[in-house]
Amino acid sequence: MTPDLNRRGAFAEHFGARLRLPLIAAPMFQVSGPDLVIAACRAGVIGAFPTANCRSVAQFDEWVSKIGAALGPADAPFCPNLIMRRESLREELAVLLRHRVEIVITSVGAPDPV
């Protein structure tokens, strides 16, 4: 069951034990990749990357798989940054759902599809 994180304090209750600091690290265009995200999560902060750093949906799927496989249940969650104006948005959303990604950032457009 997916937790309702809209309730005040719910985010901290759900993720707090896995975070050393309440921050998101590394969502940098053409810089952030799986290794940086994994390191951030293992250090206790949310590791992020823009989906635009992946050159294809297949590569995005590979990155999400690699990150998910590298992290344990006590590590901080990772957080792809979905670029809302990308042609591959629907396919990227399908990857996120298939891998049950816990957190998503949206940018460059309205987040309504998410």
Regions inferred by a protein language model and the residue ranges of each:
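Active-site entrance/lid segments in N-terminal catalytic domains of soluble metabolic enzymes
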Residues: 1-114
